[in-house]
């Protein structure tokens, strides 16, 4: 078979799953994929690689490549490498990202750009898949187009000059030189989807509705409203293209427990883990606020954990105990929850390079695995739905699961699974005849990820302490009936601190006394650039509505101590644009901000209240932070463009961060007198110079 090298760089398992799908399909198309994690540099060598390269790369943090790609990126970023270092290399790259974030698919773009700078050329156009609208909209056609591109490459490599472009929309020359063009693939690929002929694909199963659902042919449909469990024409009568069945590879044996003690320390982590006590918890909002915001103080005095303002850290959290018990009960495993789970690879598996899941510790209990290791709230991927089909006995339920994982059912999958935040438990309750084995769940459920939080303190101000702030997340899951769920981590933390929670709406500068009993496990996050400038004379602008204010409290505490230590120092202006709903309900850190303002640490404080109506004949105040930024556009432009200032934005990526970005574009356009495109280029330059920094989340 014709061999190609297949590398993946994954953070939460998405890129790995897609690479494994490519690997499985390769055999059907007459290719052999040499599959490796990009971190396994001892198993491949790009310097001497002669086969074509396919790379699947996700994005994490603020546009960073995954942790698994850290070493690889560092090596290829070596500026001493010659420009023809990879001139022999031909590759195709699929980037994964979320367009709700500013640095969309940036992990893939970083690698893609650097490979080309070192002489590598495309044999297939780069794809950018968007998790905001559904990765499959790009992933599926990109994979479908990979096979003709590989065939074309192998034909041309026999004596002809390599051709770098594979899709009909691109010319070979432009795909080598025009990086911007590749960013349009996530739109173009939806057009390409119409060009690929799926009728002859061996890796799909075409199912006729009459054959699969013949027992329902005489049923009169009275309610034409579709749902998770029911479809309507034309989908209910369509022939379906469904994915190939993922090969099973785990063999599970349950053994009675020997009674050994388990703890969250057993949870696997690439970074060091510290168990630290909670020394204080304070409610920052009133009881009638729309969201409940808590401040938690951790005692890190007996650890080697260190941080600086602007850093983030991860909290290792468990799944909800009630959800774990409900899932075990539905799987008819509740009487075996304390049994040890022994895993090994099936001797006859067809999965290439199958390995045991690294996030499941050896010999731990079933209860521990479902509580600490598996993301049971994860939205099931189509491959998981396809696997569940074969363990569903009811023909109507089987057909519906087939529809949801099919190409024809993409809209229903988005509406009833992805957008409804459906999880495995929702599906199992909605499809009662589905009885999957434990091994299947361990194969498909991803690792329970630690949750990141911004440090909301300075170690100069609070020695031996670490503060963080969070809203208790609540959301409606609408998969079957409406269910109000709390965030996995914030719901757990709220329960954990309930007995020690101080109901004050303002956090105190004073320590509350002895460390309290509850402990949590935390780990440091990789270093980022969301830090105060090294030169304290540089003016800064901070934009942080809601809990986005967290890192800026650390900035201000740090600056206060620096000014105490250097009373004659030259310190730049500090602007803060803060926003909340109501002045009297959720004005976080009100007392602290007044303190910083009074003592000249904070030079300008601009607060927006989005839900407070004007009183009497008052003019309507700035409703959101971006409105306040616009009101002070002249000063903002002066700081950024004339005084070499920095701007930091922290908070919601979906709306706020984009609105702030748009406001900055308008300000620069107006104050400098340039077109919006030129203003956008100016902001892009600020980002490159690390003077426009973001710490945002969805």
Curated annotation (Swiss-Prot):
Disease: Homocystinuria-megaloblastic anemia, cblE type: An autosomal recessive inborn error of metabolism resulting from defects in the cobalamin-dependent pathway that converts homocysteine to methionine. It causes delayed psychomotor development, megaloblastic anemia, homocystinuria, and hypomethioninemia. Cells from patients with HMAE fail to incorporate methyltetrahydrofolate into methionine in whole cells, but cell extracts show normal methionine synthase activity in the presence of a reducing agent. Neural tube defects, folate-sensitive: The most common NTDs are open spina bifida (myelomeningocele) and anencephaly.
Assigned keywords, A-Z: Amino-acid biosynthesis, Cytoplasm, Disease variant, FAD, Flavoprotein, FMN, Methionine biosynthesis, NADP, Oxidoreductase, Phosphoprotein, S-adenosyl-L-methionine
InterPro entries for the chain: CysJ-like_FAD-binding (IPR003097), FAD-bd_FR_type (IPR017927), Flavdoxin-like (IPR001094), Flavodoxin/NO_synth (IPR008254), Flavoprot_Pyr_Nucl_cyt_Rdtase (IPR001709), Flavoprotein-like_sf (IPR029039), FNR_nucleotide-bd (IPR039261), NADPH_Cyt_P450_Rdtase_alpha (IPR023173)
Organism whose genome encodes this protein: Homo sapiens
Modification type Phosphoserine: residues: 171, 189
FAD-binding FR-type domain segment(s): 271-533
Limits of the Flavodoxin-like domain: 5-147
PROSITE patterns associated with the record: FAD_FR, FLAVODOXIN_LIKE
Expression by tissue: Found in all tissues tested, particularly abundant in skeletal muscle.
Binding-site residues, FMN: 93-124
One GO MF term: flavin adenine dinucleotide binding
Enzyme Commission numbers on file: 1.16.1.8
Further details from the record: It is debated whether the reduction of free aquacob(II)alamin occurs spontaneously or is enzyme catalyzed.
UniProt: NADP(+) binding residues: 291, 610-611, 624-626, 659
Record function comment: Key enzyme in methionine and folate homeostasis responsible for the reactivation of methionine synthase (MTR/MS) activity by catalyzing the reductive methylation of MTR-bound cob(II)alamin. Cobalamin (vitamin B12) forms a complex with MTR to serve as an intermediary in methyl transfer reactions that cycles between MTR-bound methylcob(III)alamin and MTR bound-cob(I)alamin forms, and occasional oxidative escape of the cob(I)alamin intermediate during the catalytic cycle leads to the inactive cob(II)alamin species.
Requisite cofactors: FAD; FMN
Protein name listed in UniProt: Methionine synthase reductase
One Pfam family from the record: Flavodoxin_1
Subunit structure: Forms a multiprotein complex with MMACHC, MMADHC and MTR.
Entry's Gene Ontology BP terms: cobalamin metabolic process; folic acid metabolic process; homocysteine catabolic process; homocysteine metabolic process; methionine biosynthetic process; S-adenosylmethionine cycle
Name of the top EC class for this enzyme: oxidoreductase
Reaction(s) this enzyme catalyzes, per UniProt: 2 methylcob(III)alamin-[methionine synthase] + 2 S-adenosyl-L-homocysteine + NADP(+) + H(+) = 2 cob(II)alamin-[methionine synthase] + 2 S-adenosyl-L-methionine + NADPH; 2 cob(II)alamin + A + 2 H2O + 2 H(+) = 2 aquacob(III)alamin + AH2
Record: residues binding FAD: 451-454, 487-490, 697
Ranges for region Hinge: 166-247
Entry GO terms, CC: cytosol; intermediate filament cytoskeleton; nucleoplasm
